[in-house]
């Protein structure tokens, strides 16, 4: 046995013996577990709205506020070009990046539930500090605590959902994380729209309300069951079997339980999971799951739209309230897309959705870039009719992303890793994701200022590259039991060279 996967055809044949029924216990566990996405989503949605509020800018960034009020023609794309302002957004993701390594240890030793609880406490503290902030240092400190919370939550929640779900509906269940993320973004935008009208402390309310999902997640986490996979990994076999019976709704769980035990036995033989992740036999998981997909998910440019939608729409000539309304519409489209993806992932497959959406997103980014090149900048005012067309195009882009790269960027990596490298692999996934999230957050506004419309064409080129990556390197994982995904590499034109003969 290698890679913690089943090493013979008997393992693959055993998958058809798995049984499950949807129980209230299973539904409760998935709903509470997926709430980790609401933390991530609320922050994604609230940051851009707050940084576009005049009261927030006057208190912490008076220079940007004055420049914004002057309506200088040369600052059409550059109104918000300030590295400290972008650090307010990106500091959270740099903190999350660093925290993922501690989160990997907690997730492996104390379970997925332990990381969920730690993440909710840290996120709560960050929300309190940000709401009470008196200076930029307090803002950044609060963001660091929020980042630690997101690092732990993003480490544990996708694993939790993948391990709790039966193979046949794993795609749908795992995408609860994306759905709650999208709902968090939408709620944050609706709150920003209301709090912008509360002077001069509305921004404090927006930031402080981050404590609400943190409290709900903590309270739910106290009664949340640990995953059978994690319990087996900790040597609690009887408890693991009891939980598996409850979440599957049947006593006939011996085949699945045996697979979990065998995978755990292989995992225990691995003393250093991070070093094992670099082993030749794990090269497909490393390249695709740990690095490629999480990096490309951010390089679509989607999070730039989520971070800075209100700021971007204001830069394109929309008023303050109009920009918040436009970004709210955009994020409502993201929620619709997340619901669509819950149905389509297990019906059409992960690979098809990624490829189809890449074509769509490429086209939308090109059209937006060319439109802005011809009609905006250098003192030109953007016609309202054209502005509405841009909002529609961005909504279509969001719909494509929200049913593909958004959920698949978390779902597919969580499916690929064998048990002995799963917590380490997910740690690298979150680390890479947050690194590129922070990089994009820190660089987007300055890139918008210097590249102007070219930033959208740059994202179009990146999307073309990531579509090619999926086409050539990613096999379909739809309805494959999570402990048997490893067997797919043996049938792939490239990856079979890395995994063949490792079990002999």
Swiss-Prot record:
CDD domains membership: MFS_STP
Subcellular location: Membrane
Cytoplasmic side stretches: 1-25, 475-504
Highest taxon, organism lineage: Eukaryota
Keywords annotated in UniProt: Membrane, Sugar transport, Symport, Transmembrane, Transmembrane helix, Transport
A GO-annotated cellular component: plasma membrane
Chain ranges passing through the membrane: 26-46, 84-104, 121-141, 144-164, 171-191, 205-225, 286-308, 315-337, 352-372, 382-402, 428-448, 454-474
GO molecular function annotation: monosaccharide transmembrane transporter activity; symporter activity
InterPro entries hit by this protein: MFS_dom, MFS_STP/MST-like_plant, MFS_sugar_transport-like, MFS_trans_sf, STP/PLT_plant, Sugar/inositol_transpt, Sugar_transporter_CS
Membrane topology classification: Multi-pass membrane protein
Family recorded in the similarity comment: Belongs to the major facilitator superfamily. Sugar transporter (TC 2.A.1.1) family.
Function of the molecule: Mediates an active uptake of hexoses, probably by sugar/hydrogen symport.
Protein name listed in UniProt: Sugar transport protein 14
Lineage per the UniProt record: Eukaryota, Viridiplantae, Streptophyta, Embryophyta, Tracheophyta
